[in-house]
Amino acid sequence: MKVEPLWSLDVGTQPVYSLVRTPDGTKMYAATGKTVVTFGPGPEITRQTSTQHPLVTCLAISPDGHMVVSMGTDGAVMFNDSTGAALFKYSHQNEVQAAAFSPDGSLFVSAAIGDVGIYHCRDVKTKVMKQSFKGTPRAIAWAPGSDWFVISTQDGDLVIMTPEGMELNSCNLGAPAWALKVVQCSSFLVQPNTALDVDIANSSDDEFTIPQTVTPSASASGRSGSGKRHKVELDREEFITSHNMDNFRILVASWDMRYRVINPSVYADGACIAKMTDGGSDSRSRSSSRRRLDGLLVAVSEIPFIPLCMEIIGNYVFLSGVGGSVVVLNSSNGRVLSSLYQVWESDPFISKAPLIPTESQSKHLPQKRTIMGQVTTCTDVNQRLMELRKREAMANRNVKNVTNPLAFHGMHTIWCYSMIHVEPSSLILGLSNGVLLCLSLRYAMIHSQYGSLYAYRRGLMSVSVMNLSTGRESILEVGMHVENLSIYESTLAIKTSSRLLLYRLQDPALKKRNIESVMDYYSSSTNGLIETDRSRRQNMSSLSYSFETSIKKRFVCSQLIVSNNHFFLCNVSHISVHDFSGKQTDRWTFKQLKCTYVRSIGGIPSNEAVLVGFDTGKVCIFKIGNKFPIELLLHRSPIVSLDISPDRKYISVVDRSDVVSVYKFLDDSEIVLGATNMAVVEHENTPTSYSRIAALAHVSLDGNLPGITTGQDYSVPLYTFKGTTSAIWDLVLPGVLARSTQKSVDICIDSGVSYTFQLSYPGSFVLCQNGNRAFIFNVSYLGQSLVNLDYSSLIEMVEVPMMPMVIYRTHKVLRMLLDSNYEAGAVFPSQAANYELNEAIKAANLGVPMDCWRDLAIAALLSNELDLAREVLATIGDIRSLKAIAEITRQTSTKTYLLLSALALSMCDHFSEASLLFAASDDIQMATELLFFINRECIPYNSPNSSLISSIAKKLICRELHSSLTGTEEKILEVLKTQGDSTYSPLGTQTAPEAKETNTALLTDFSDKLLAKGRATVNKFLSAIESGSSKADGPGNDNKDTYNYFNDYRILLRRQISSFAKTESERANLVVRHSKFLETSLEWRAAAASYLDMDDPESAIDVLITSKQTGALLRLVRIFPPVARELNHKAPSFNDFESPEDADEYAPSSVQNQMLKRAYRKALVYFEKSNDYSNAIFIAQRLGDPLVLLRLLIQQGSWSQVEALGKAYPEMMPSIHEAKASMLLREGRFIEALERLRLSGNTSKEAIIIKQLIDASIAECKFNLTRALTGQLAKQIAKTRAFAALSVSSMEYYAAIKAIRARVLVYTGYQQVMEYMVNILRSRDLSDITMIRLHDNTQSAKVVTAGIFLTSYAAMANELTNADSVFSEELENNTGILSGEDTVKASSQRSKKDNPPSLRSTIGFITSSTTPQLGSLAHIDLGINNMNIPPGISELIIWVCLALASRRTYPEVEARALKRILASRIPGPMIGYFRRQMLLVKGTPAKDFSHGESSDAESRDACPRCAAPLKALPPSRPVGAQDMAILSSLPHCCPVFSDICKNCGSPIVRSALSLKILPLVLAEPDDETSIAVALERAAAVEMDIEALMGETNRLEIGTDDLQTDEGVVDVLRRASIAGDGRGAVLTSEQFEKISPANIFIVDDTWSNPSLLPRFVVGNVIKRFFIRTISDFQLHYCTGCGFFFDGIEYEEYVIVTGSCPICGATNIVL
């Protein structure tokens, strides 16, 4: 640990007795003289505050930093805020030198001579509690839990007290104690279990024996006798047990130069423990006065000066005091770990204060780059700096003889009175001359790494060993200062100042393998290594290291290297080897060279070797047992670091110029063994890039030691990288180099960079590269803290993608294949390709996408590496490809390699090349299947290696097909050769070379071949498809892009493959399959062209119709010739039927003609469905079918052409007349339509058309026309009866007449309803009938009458039949031919004449003049499902009419109708009216609450919210638009609009039985309170509401009450709006204050959730009702949604067993 002064400040001439800082370290306070100086970490003095104290002796600051307390010799204790303003003060009788805040900030303790003051900071009203105290207090320390504190005095007493002033324990140290702390035991280091014998003569880590006897102190007993007495025995034991005082330790340093650790839970009763370490004293003379105190004194040690101040950082104690020395101790045992600094009076930082250096600050910063293996000078840095400063200081003072700085310096005038720690790594000392000195603590990193094992020093006395791959960790508590360490396989060596400790790893799996592979990690964990949360790895077993031996010698070295049975001590000028007994076995000395770097490279046990770099650039190997080093290479610059690849092929060298060079390591062929005088022979053509070995050369480094040559022939590296800080080789993937720069890390393969990632902190470097994980050493934490460093802070894991590495090696293999001589038929498998594929598989196993695996399999198949290809395919689970390989290799064919190559091409989507290869190997079936995967543009495949694969495939095609292709096919081959020519893609780039465009020079050849096929129609269509005419339109217009059949790459390839077919059937099968594939792939135009290419127009039409390619279909049918036909009669010809001159004619009986006819019919159906009649007529003309043409002309409305067609075909005239009649009917020309029907001669349809006319007149409400048409129908029936016998159809006519008359009656009533809606409400919407003002019965009489018409219709079927009986008899007897009006009149007269009045009243026949009676409504049975209601009639209209008609006359019918109306949940203002009527009918059947006041008004006649008077049942009034909006948002249980209070606007809630006003107030949350919070707060806290009620037992709404926070009035809305119908608006706090027993939370399922979205929970509105009288009994029924008076409801339920409103039976009272 390196310590340097950062700055100094001169704050006064008097000593700085106290230093404090805020928790965040932004402000610090120093006490000097009578001034308190405030300064920052900069440093800069921000304020100097002069106090009233003659001398400030002590400062204290609260844990939150808001209060600063100053104390002085006058005994005053002054509290100030952070700005210096005085808050309050209190006084002691004598000076105060000790004070402290409790850790939680609640208590403050100040101690003076004679008393102790305890102040409660959080209670300003509490006075200071004074306790008597004997002695001169010097320090106070609180326990971490603020439960007790310790006071040390000038007499050496330690007194433990509680905040209440009770004394728990005390002891005497025998000397003044100014430095005091209390810590928890968990912060102590755990000592190793193995006992270590310490040689005191050779070690500074001395251990002291602690006798367990003490001598009572007279001063202690005297002090305790003068204090306040308590029941100490009982209280002390209870307090110690309850507060776990055994888990704490008191750390104290006294003036007898001793450091002690004391257990506060052991009772000492003032005993003196000063001589517990005097083992040589005569104990027999004092044995009677001693008592056994087990466990009181935990540890004791000596310190080299009188301590005055103490600071704790982690597990270490920093002490300073008389003489200005600063030392660091082990907090658990007090060992002096290091002497950090010595303050000299003549030091420039002291004598020239203030001193804030600027340039030296950056000059003395430690080097951030900490690379393992660097060799430096072994002298301790702090000792060297201390000696240098001592010489400078003594030279200034002219003092020659200076004693050891670790001894007591009485001559020193500089004392350190105070000390504070400032994060992250600074100490500020307060000196006796008024100077503040800041020291910087720089923590040196001691670590070692071997493979995946990494060991580093935690703090100063612990070593952490971890496996980077698995995350397993082991922490070794050494207990001594760790100076160096080394790890190798299962051996760990730790060097301290006095010995060397050896540990062994107890892991059998690791003993078998030197390095744990990264694959071990994947088999055991899925979360990676670096986990900041250690709890995630608790279930993982840790590394188990056992102590083996201790070599008790003091070794001096800069770098320690350990092997299985030896260890290397490396220094700048020599390297020595020792066995585990400490005996030296080998030694190499360098006189002219300086060793700069050492790295272990392993070897045979007991013959391990190290790799050593020198400042001259030499790199050598030193091997145990071999006196002659081996020179590997000579570099041009001094060596900084070295590394060797795992396969021992390459060595990387990093020099001082930040350049990494990669050399080839030793080859077996270059090593000559045996003869010592053998010279190394080098051929003239030996490459200089390979390193040479100078074995047994008789030239040494200094001229004496043989083994290393001195020639200046520098070795030539394979490649270099600049700007490199470190470089290491991958442990799993040989040949992969991790190169660290200042800001990033490059993953290199050969001379290229495959992946780069940025460093989170500049200057960090790769510690270990293990496959796909890079472990980064973070240098940002170096030298900043002495607290135990955790590996999660030091090491960062970065995932390295393996895909670039796999792509590079696969690309390299493919490049090898491309450079091979394919034309000569070279054998592809080679050793180089095998090596690259194996390395690629290793990288792929660490995780790459599926595409990389497929590229690997393709490269293996193209390289003829079947075993590797099977391995890759098995890894990704490609069973299909494995089976294909097995089938291909099972065949004995000379084209096996060709088939494997075709399989590889098909796997990477190079289907065109693969299909040609399969076709060339006589596998047309497979070639056809691959043809399905080819696009028409031949787009280059999106793969980094696609370009190379295409080039390799095309070379294979050229070699295999060159001999069998001629003419046009060879030209196609040339196109394939030039298409997509590949270029080499550099490593690290993701861009693939673009393929060249397809050469179109050969299109003419294919078009000529197509023309030679002999069909002009196909040629025309292909040309039309290619041109893409823009005139075509329709729903599937395909003119967005043009399609060129001749440039379709699939068609070109299909023709090329078809040339390899041996038979015509194979060729036809290929075309059919490809055409069907194009059709299923939605390639409609390509499929249609393919079908035409094989003379199948029907299939082409099907394809275009299915795809709705209207434009292409239209172009095709215009090109087709007309259907050939044989005419049996001479008919006039039309130009549309003429065939084009250049069109081909088929024979009428030919297969082609039949196919063409079917194609035309399919196209005709398509255009007809699309309402494209112009094109449909054209197709019908080509088809030659006059009936179809007639139908289309009629649908089109071309009557002139229809008439002309009728003249040409007379047999079609009846159909033309009927069609014309239908058209006239649609136009309303009924007489002309009937005339056309008579001309058609189809009299059977005349009556049907008349009936259709009647239906149309009824639908249009033209009832006079309906009666006339009914008479016309009767005449038609009579005419039929006069000329022919009565048929069965005549009976149907009679039934039709009956139904027509019934419908006339029904729609007459319906017309009355509509007339009323239009005249009164100005609306034709039947749902608006609820807007009728029902209180005016005269205005609703017509509606009631109309409703009775509608409801009575279905119940009078028999009456209607009897009414038409006379008319039916006249028709059957044929007594006369009557008109429609005469028939109706005669029927009425005959009915009046023959039937008596009683019969007519019984029948109840309804005519337009009949007025219905209300009494008949009681006998109508509509049923639950409303099966008897006429279709199209609203059920709501019927129930409203029934409710109005039966009011006060038929209560049961009215109740039933009202229930159905409420169940329908009608919107608008009618809901309030019907709720009221329902309550009147069901609630009080014996009373009438219609409009007057109730006689029982004494129950509740006031508003429960504002106490405004209300009527028991107010009368109803007209409802306006605003009222409708208010009623829509009212709860279901608030019956009518008239019950809204006019004063406060609250809706009234009535009992559904007696209509009493219930003491319920509607409430709702405010805008800032959500419904969820309101529901939660409403059921949380109970509150007494009765105490808030007035004498009138109502809520008092006084002004004073509104200003308080108590009472229900606070929850009522303060500014209510009269008539708004809203409830009281509450906040969440007000909801919480109301008792849950007085809040009713109701689910309002009757209201529309969209009206009140803020109150909706689960699509249901939540309502809050507050009961204002807590003892009033209420009941709420969830079935009907009404509130009831509790007593009334219970009486009714007990009698009937159900709810009086909804009839629910599952009621809980």
Curated annotation (Swiss-Prot):
| Annotated localization | Cell projection, Cilium, Flagellum; Cytoplasm, Cytoskeleton, Flagellum axoneme; Cytoplasm, Cytoskeleton, Flagellum basal body
* Keyword Repeat on entry: yes
Q: Does the keyword Disulfide bond apply?
A: no
GO CC terms: 9+2 motile cilium; axoneme; ciliary basal body; ciliary pocket collar; ciliary tip; intraciliary transport particle A; non-motile cilium
Q: Which UniProt keywords apply?
A: Cell projection, Cilium, Cilium biogenesis/degradation, Cytoplasm, Cytoskeleton, Flagellum, Leucine-rich repeat, Repeat, WD repeat
- Among the record's GO biological process terms, what is one? protein localization to cilium
Q: Which domain of life is it from?
A: Eukaryota
Q: Which SMART domains match?
A: WD40
Q: Where are the WD repeats?
A: 51-89, 132-171, 634-673
**Ranges where the record places region Disordered:** 209-229, 1378-1404
Q: Main location per UniProt?
A: other
- What InterPro entries does the record tag this protein with? Beta-prop_IFT122_2nd (IPR056152), Ift122/121 (IPR039857), WD40/YVTN_repeat-like_dom_sf (IPR015943), WD40_repeat_dom_sf (IPR036322), WD40_rpt (IPR001680)
Stretches forming LRR repeats: 1231-1256, 1414-1436
PANTHER family from the UniProt entry: INTRAFLAGELLAR TRANSPORT PROTEIN 122 HOMOLOG, WD REPEAT DOMAIN-RELATED
- Quote the function comment for this protein: Component of the intraflagellar transport complex A (IFT-A) involved in flagellar assembly.
Q: What is this protein called?
A: Intraflagellar transport protein 122
